[in-house]
Structures are given as C-alpha cells and as structure tokens.
Amino acid sequence: MKDIVVYFTGTGKNKKVAEAIKEYLKCDVIEVKDKLKRNFLRDSFYSLIGASVEIEPKTFDFKDYERVFIVTPIWAFNIPAPMRTFLTRNKDAIKDREIVFVSSCGLGEKNRPVINKLSKILGKNVSASLLIEETNVDSQVYKDIISKFLDNI
C-alpha cells in the first residue's frame, strides 16, 4: 500500500507531525501552502465561514496512492481555509482512497467534532484519526504517540 501525507501548517507543528509520519512510513509528502500571510483573526474567520483561498498546489494526482493522511491544525473548531480549499478541489481525486486524519491542535480530543466536518467536506468518513495536543509536539512526545497510532491502523 502506497501512502501520502498532505499537510498544512500555520506554526510549524503540523509540519513536524507530517514529517514524523513520513519518516515512520517512508511515504511521500506534499505541503499545501496558501498565499496569505498569517493573521489570526482573518484565518479564524475564514475557517468559520468556509472561505476558499489561493493555494499551491491547486490539485494533485492521487492515482498512485491508496491511503491519504490529512495533517492540519484546527482553527476556530474548523478545518483551516487552505486545507479545506485543497480538499474541496481534490475531493473526486481522493474519493476512492482511505483517509486518515491527524492534527496537532490546542484542545486535542475536544476537537473531535471537527472530524464530522471533514467527512462532510470529503463526502466520506475517515478510517482513522488522531488529535495530538500541541503541548505534546512541543515536548517531543508526539513521535511516540504517532508511532503507536500508526502501528494500530
């Protein structure tokens, strides 16, 4: 089974998570980048209203992959606009793939309802999910958490 990690990061924490998954699974990785400078209020607002933003890459060919790891922060109890934009544009390309959601987020498991929002964006359920509290990324505990999670999916 060939895997790919698709990640977006605002502070760099989800990049660390994506790189840990890549290292553990020896898989490919792509970063979704938006063209806006970080602004807490605007970013939160865009997440709340479901706004689309300019991103790179706009689309991606997932034909060589069976499992897609979506790694992103959670902003204002929503998927950030850059990742939402990417997923909306690539929804058909990943519809037949297994989806795994991983996030480094401030509230950890309290953000679990966001997974339902992700499922609505994708039009399908995720097969597994992991919500890592940001403090675990700061303390380097996240690598153990990720490896245990990956061993069990």
Placement of each model-derived feature along the sequence:
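Residues at alpha-helix caps and immediate loop-helix transition turns in enzyme cores, especially N-
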Residues: 17, 79-83, 110-114, 141-142
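Glycine-rich phosphate/pyrophosphate-binding loop and the adjoining helix
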Residues: 126-153
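Short, structured coil segments at secondary-structure junctions
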Residues: 25, 121-125
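Short, aromatic/basic amphipathic alpha-helical patches
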Residues: 112-122
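Short, conserved loop/helix-junction motifs that constitute active-site signature segments
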Residues: 62-63, 88-96, 122-123
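Short beta-alpha junction loops
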Residues: 103-109, 134-135
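N-terminal beta1-alpha1-beta2 submodule of the flavodoxin-like/Rossmannoid cofactor-binding fold
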Residues: 1-71, 77-80, 85-88, 147-153
